[in-house]
Structures are given as structure tokens and as C-alpha cells.
């Protein structure tokens, strides 16, 4: 429908109508629907730990349900005790010292990202987005009036962008750099030296930086997590940190995230949230309080399992002709290149892109994967290894069998 269409005839606004469905959630929903219909589908689509939330966190929520004070409205920006605990947890885990007044508690990381961009972007402001990227980032930027500018890295650099690439993408309209380490979808982890170089470049150019630290505790081997505002402290006044309990504590369904930033930005984002959703569910906030106040024993156990699965999935994927899978250093995703398989005949079909290849894998092997188009880089597939060991081996074995049939 054209922009000239009378307002009374436009059923959906152009702004919201332009938003794409979350590709990762769509793949996960399709896999679950097929399973419900009786097909033995194995899903590698969802970025979700397969572990239950630790019991001490659940018990805190159960107790909160019975406490009348949590049956009422609470401050829109979050329970004061949770904000203080998040500040303490941030200092403990990353060395970044912040005040509770710099914290906004949100309904998960997605709301945190949108509200952060909404608080600092004006129409036309550009945000440099290293690709491959998580599907939600560009949509949040556009909703906030900004313009995402992709900077693509591939497997030859371990999916890490360089300062030279970032500088080439910078214009007079550039306001923000999005920085994510460990990365979804690639599992890339930047070294301290790389973070320092990128951070100092951003500081010299006067840019804001939004850094997503949701996978801070999921790093493997010799890789280490480093918080950008700790490595480059002069960025603190123009740095926004997004985090949450979902990945570290297996709490994806509880929907608790947060934004840490300069007080004026947090105040603006809190005002926005006061009109959008008000406070996050009090029961979920109390559960998050128990999570961030506790130790990291549970995540250590999960990390050990993820590390084992990481090694298995990389080995098995690299056994497939035409597949190249770098070893991820963080998060829980493998991001193999399958460019060499595109256009080849597989069971009577010739997939021309990874959307078609992913559809073929789902139909023929009954395995759900996410095509690279969802992350801004066609020619790749994302597979989450946050699923049981047996399912992981069975699922990749099915993919091996199917793709071994590829021929010119």
C-alpha cells in the first residue's frame, strides 16, 4: 500500500508493518508445531538453555507469590533491591562499578535493547552494526528511528570486525556503535586488545556504544570475557550495557533484563517504560534478585555441558563436505559456512540460498536450523547447541546424511 493511501484505509502503520518476524522464534515455532503433529523434529533454532531454572531461584519466586507487597505496582524502573543487586553483580562479574540509579530493569533483553536505542537515537541517526548480528538489533534500531549500517565479517577473521572496517562505515550521521562479545550468532569473542582498539576508536570519534553482555559467562577454552567500559573507561559516559538473567541462569521465560548507562539516559528510558509496560512482574524480579545475588555454580555446570557439545557439533559439522565451521569461543551457537553446497543437487532440489537449504533440511532431515539471511549474512546456518547431547548427535547425523548426497 503506497504512502499516498488515505489514513483511514491503512490498516497497519508503515512503521510497524515493516518489522520482520523474529526468524529464530519462527523457526523454533515451526519445529515445535511439527513435533506436535507427530514428526520427530530436532530443533537447533532456539537460543535457549535446555536446563531448568535453578531451584533456589524458583523457590524465591514461589515465596514472592505469597507476599502481598508483590501483588501491587512497584517502581517502573525496577525494585530498588534488585537494581542494587545488579550493580553489585556487575562489579563482581566484570569489574564495572555503577550506581543503582544507573540501572533500569526491563522485560527481558529485547525491551532493554529497544529502550536503550529509543533513548539516544533521533530520526536518521546511524548505528554501526557488525554482522552477522542477532535478528532483533536492526529492528529495534529502525523502530527507534535509527538507520542500521551493516559491517560484515566472515569466517576468515573469526567473524570479528576491524577498526578499519568500522571507520570505513562511519559517516557524519553515525551516532552509535553496537558491540557484542560473545556474539550471537557466531560465538565470536573479541580479545582484550581488540576491544581496547575498538573502544578507543569509538571514544576518539565521540560515538556512543551499546554493548550487549548477555553471554558474559559463556566463554570456553582460552577465551576471556572483557567488559568494554572497563577496558576503555573513558567511554563510560557514552556507554550503555545491556544484560539479563536469561542465558546465565536458564531463565529465558522469566523475562528479566536490564540496561546500565548514564543517569540521564536511564531516566529517559525509565520514563518510556513507565508508559509502555510499567514495572516488570514482581515475582520475576524477585527470582532475578535471587539469581544475581547467588553464586555462579549453576552456570559453571551449564558451561561445562555447553563446552562438551560445542566440541562435538564443530567436529561433526566439519566432517561434512562443503561445510566450514570455525570453533565458537562463546555463547552456544555454531555458525558454519555452507556456501559450497548452494546450487548443488540434494534429493532432487538445488537450493540457491540458505533459506532454501534450511527448508530442505527441515523437510528431508527433520532438523530445524536458522538460515544466515536472518543474521545479515547469507550463506551460513546457525545451530544452537543448547540442547541435549543425544539430540545434538542425532540431529547433526541427520544433516550429515542429507548433505553427503549433494552433487553437481
UniProtKB/Swiss-Prot annotation:
Its cofactor is pyridoxal 5'-phosphate. The modification N6-(pyridoxal phosphate)lysine is found at residue 247. It is found in: Cytoplasm. L-aspartate binds at residues 45, 134, 184, 382. Its main location: cytoplasm. Keywords: Aminotransferase, Cytoplasm, Pyridoxal phosphate, Transferase. SUPFAM superfamilies: PLP-dependent transferases. GO terms for cellular component: cytoplasm. The keyword Cytoplasm applies. It catalyses: L-aspartate + 2-oxoglutarate = oxaloacetate + L-glutamate. One of its GO terms (biological process) is biosynthetic process. Its EC number is 2.6.1.1. Pfam families: Aminotran_1_2. It is an enzyme of class 2 (transferase). CDD domains: AAT_like. Gene3D superfamilies: Aspartate Aminotransferase, domain 1, Type I PLP-dependent aspartate aminotransferase-like (Major domain). GO terms for molecular function: L-aspartate:2-oxoglutarate aminotransferase activity; pyridoxal phosphate binding. Homodimer. Catalyzes the reversible conversion of aspartate and 2-oxoglutarate to glutamate and oxaloacetate. Does not have prephenate aminotransferase activity. Belongs to the class-I pyridoxal-phosphate-dependent aminotransferase family. PANTHER family: ASPARTATE AMINOTRANSFERASE (PTHR46383:SF1). This is Aspartate aminotransferase.
Amino acid at each position: 500500500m503506497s504512502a499516498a493511501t488515505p489514513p483511514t484505509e491503512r490498516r497497519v502503520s508503515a512503521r510497524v508493518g515493516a518489522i520482520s518476524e523474529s526468524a529464530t522464534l519462527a523457526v523454533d515455532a515451526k519445529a515445535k508445531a511439527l513435533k506436535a503433529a507427530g514428526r520427530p523434529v530436532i530443533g537447533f533454532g532456539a537460543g535457549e538453555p535446555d536446563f531448568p531454572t535453578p531451584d533456589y531461584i524458583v523457590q524465591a519466586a514461589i515465596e514472592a507469590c505469597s507476599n502481598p507487597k508483590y501483588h501491587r505496582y512497584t517502581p517502573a524502573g525496577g525494585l530498588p533491591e534488585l537494581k542494587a543487586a545488579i550493580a553489585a553483580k556487575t562489579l563482581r562479574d566484570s569489574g564495572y562499578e555503577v550506581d543503582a540509579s544507573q540501572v533500569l530493569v526491563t522485560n527481558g533483553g529485547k525491551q532493554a535493547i529497544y529502550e536503550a536505542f529509543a533513548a539516544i537515537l533521533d530520526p536518521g541517526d546511524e548505528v554501526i552494526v557488525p554482522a552477522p548480528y542477532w535478528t532483533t538489533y536492526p529492528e529495534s534500531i529502525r523502530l527507534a528511528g535509527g538507520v542500521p549500517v551493516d559491517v560484515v565479517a566472515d569466517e576468515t577473521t573469526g567473524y570479528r570486525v576491524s577498526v578499519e572496517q568500522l571507520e570505513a562505515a562511519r559517516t557524519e550521521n553515525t551516532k552509535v556503535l553496537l558491540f557484542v562479545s560473545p556474539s550471537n550468532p557466531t560465538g565470536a569473542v573479541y580479545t582484550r586488545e581488540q576491544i581496547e582498539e575498538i573502544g578507543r576508536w569509538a571514544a576518539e570519534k565521540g560515538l556512543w556504544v551499546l554493548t550487549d553482555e548477555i553471554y558474559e559467562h559463556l566463554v570456553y577454552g582460552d577465551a576471556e570475557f572483557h567488559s568494554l567500559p572497563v577496558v576503555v573507561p573513558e567511554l563510560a559516559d557514552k556507554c550503555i550495557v545491556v544484560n539479563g538473567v536469561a542465558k546465565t541462569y536458564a531463565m529465558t521465560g522469566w523475562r528479566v533484563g536490564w540496561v546500565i548507562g548514564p543517569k540521564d539516559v536511564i531516566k529517559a528510558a525509565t520514563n518510556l517504560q513507565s508508559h509502555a509496560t510499567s514495572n516488570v512482574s514482581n515475582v520475576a524480579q524477585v527470582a532475578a534478585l535471587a539469581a544475581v545475588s547467588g553464586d555462579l555454580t549453576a552456570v559453571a555446570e551449564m558451561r561445562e555441558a555447553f563446552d562438551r557439545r560445542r566440541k562435538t557439533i564443530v567436529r561433526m559439522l566439519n566432517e561434512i563436505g562443503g561445510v566450514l565451521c570455525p570453533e565458537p569461543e562463546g555463547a552456544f551457537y555454531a555458525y558454519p559456512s555452507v556456501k559450497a553446497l548452494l546450487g548443488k543437487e540434494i534429493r532432487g532440489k538445488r537450493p540457491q540460498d540458505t533459506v532454501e537449504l534450511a527448508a530442505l533440511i527441515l523437510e528431508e532431515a527433520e532438523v530445524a536450523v536458522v538460515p544466515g539471511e536472518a543474521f545479515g549474512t547469507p550463506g551460513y546456518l546457525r545451530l544452537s547447541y543448547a540442547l541435549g547431547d543425544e539430540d545434538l548427535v542425532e540431529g547433526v547425523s541427520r544433516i550429515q546424511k542429507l548433505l553427503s548426497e549433494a552433487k553437481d
